[in-house]
Amino acid sequence: MVKQWFGVSRFVYNTTVKLLQDSSLKANWKAIKTDILNGLPEWSKSVPYQIKSIAIKDACKSVSNAKKKLKNGGGMSKIRFRSRKDTVQSCYIPKSAVKDVGIYHTILGEATFKEALPQSFGDCRLVFAYRDYYLTVPQDVPQQKSDNQGRVVALDPGIRTFITFFSECSFGEIGTAANLQIQKLCFRLDKLISKFTKAKCKQRRRMKLAASRLRGKIKNLVDEFHKKTARFLVDNFDIILLPTFETSQMSKKAKRRIRSKSVRQMLTLGHYRFKQFLKHKAFETNKVVMDVNEAYTSKTVSWTGEIIPNLGGAKFVKSPSDGQVMSRDMNGARGIFLRALVDTPSLKECIC
């Protein structure tokens, strides 16, 4: 029955998007809701009203955001239809339907949650991702109060080492060779996908389910890595200097200087998702994340100021003048730290 809810929600969303392709219609979900709901087929009548109603609202919001982006000069955005083949499906669940005994328990029956529900929460979404069901429950959490001790840390994101950090009193690496375990799972996934075309119907279905489980395992490993790293940073530092790590630009085929294997490792580690999550945790704990410029910090020897033009993919940086050697990632983090102290006037305000 839950799969039917996802299907009807998807059908209503796609119907609304198709209707709004007519430029004469405004994306006002309350104005078009009644006509759309009355025109739905008989097999969708048993699905709760609010699930269908909010699917219309979601479609109108997507169209409105695309129009707003075009108006503000952000370029044309194409609103795509939802597909039953999407790895993540979701539908709206009102908070009145969520009880300790389950979701819509009078329809679905009683169910148990892995975690206790908070005392007060808002409207939820039921998510089906990588063969598992999740109920996302929003709640209001007050911002934590903390004393600003002026502890500054610079981060250097990378591929071989996920994060290298450097501060006034400490330095280190987080996730040294973190991508090795993830890459093993990626290779297993590639090997499994390569067998799809040779498999028969039932075997192919089992393989697709196994591939979905592997994708979920990879995503869960990366998410856990992000959360533990963010927790360490916000617990030990007050100001976090994070360079603008342009993964989308670095991975474009036309201009990139790194191989496809490195591109895959970089995209799998999800540096942009980590950046967004870190900013969220920093706001929650009353800490500051500052976007800084990392230009030439890897090529510049941080203790002499010399520039090494042909550094390439070297793991270490060696000073031409004194012969001292430092890890490339550590040199980059130290360079970001020193550069931010000079080039970022707002840093002084945050420290004080």
Residue ranges and their predicted role:
Residues 8, 12-15, 19, 58-61, ...:
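Residues on one face of amphipathic alpha-helical coiled coils
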Residues 16, 54-66, 330-343:
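Stable alpha-helical structural segments in soluble proteins, enriched in small hydrophobic residues
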Residues 1-41:
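Detector for conserved single-position "signature" residues within domains
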Residues 21-25, 68-72, 282-288:
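Surface-exposed helix-capping loop/turn segments at secondary-structure junctions
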Residues 29-129, 264-268:
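Acidic carboxylate diad motif detector
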Residues 129-352:
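Positively charged, helix-rich recognition surfaces that bind polyanionic ligands
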Residues 18-22, 29-31, 70-82, 199-209, ...:
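Short coil/turn segments at secondary-structure boundaries
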